[in-house]
């Protein structure tokens, strides 16, 4: 009889423990859902409150986006800063293979880029095209972003993406050759860009510059090869 009673007591205690654990998990899930929603709405104060209550900074939504990734997509610097200060992982990539560092570099979101670098972003991670943050930044002519990447990270200036393009190549092929792009080319070369790396078809940056009639860029490339 005693053993049976003891067994029943243990069972009740176990079930109570399970119930409490389930309640905690339910509460945490609710907080994480609220955190994602608050980030989406750019409600920074609510985000901060939820973080103080213990919400998981690295929870992901149905698209694999963390709250920090959502804030980055919206260029919401204030919320991004709060999330990073709370320990958000800046290297987590979503289903599109974007992460805060990669996307901020590609879109020219300078302030968020700096925050991710300060938080230990991995510059070797690549996007869905196999490119580093430097490649799209060079295409778009984001001078400040390019300088930040080249001077504050160990990013590979000669990394080749899936198309066979380096940052230098992309800055030629996908640009209009204006003064900003000329500055980009010069900046990349000053930081070790190899002007002779061809694309997957064996076409060099110089040949592409000539094909686009980018005379000033052609001069820069020729001067580098002297």
Predicted regions, residues:
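N-terminal segments that cap or nucleate solenoid repeat domains
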Residues: 22-70
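C-terminal motif of bacterial Sec signal peptides marking the signal peptidase cleavage site
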Residues: 16-17
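Ankyrin repeat A-helix N-terminal signature
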Residues: 37-42, 70-76, 103-109, 136-142, ...
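Leucine-rich solenoid repeat scaffolds
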Residues: 195-226
């Amino acid at each position: 009889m005693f053993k049976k009673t003891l067994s029943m007591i243990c069972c009740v205690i176990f079930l109570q423990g399970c119930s409490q654990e389930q309640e905690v998990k339910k509460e945490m899930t609710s907080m994480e859902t609220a955190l994602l929603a608050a980030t989406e709405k750019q409600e920074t104060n609510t985000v901060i409150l939820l973080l103080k209550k213990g919400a998981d900074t690295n929870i992901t939504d149905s698209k694999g986006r963390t709250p920090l990734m959502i804030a980055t997509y919206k260029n919401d610097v204030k919320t991004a800063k709060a999330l990073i200060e709370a320990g958000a992982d800046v290297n987590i990539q979503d289903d599109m293979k974007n992460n805060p560092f990669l996307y901020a570099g590609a879109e020219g979101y300078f302030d968020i880029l700096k925050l991710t670098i300060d938080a230990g972003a991995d510059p070797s991670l690549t996007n869905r095209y196999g490119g580093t943050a430097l490649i799209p930044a060079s295409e778009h002519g984001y001078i400040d972003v390019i300088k930040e990447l080249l001077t504050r990270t160990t990013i590979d200036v000669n990394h080749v993406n899936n198309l066979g393009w380096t940052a230098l190549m992309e800055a030629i092929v996908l640009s209009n050759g204006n003064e900003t792009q000329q500055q980009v080319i010069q900046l990349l070369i000053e930081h070790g860009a190899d002007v002779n790396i061809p694309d997957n078809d064996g076409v060099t940056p110089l040949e592409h510059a000539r094909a686009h009639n980018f005379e000033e860029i052609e001069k820069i490339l020729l001067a580098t090869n002297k």
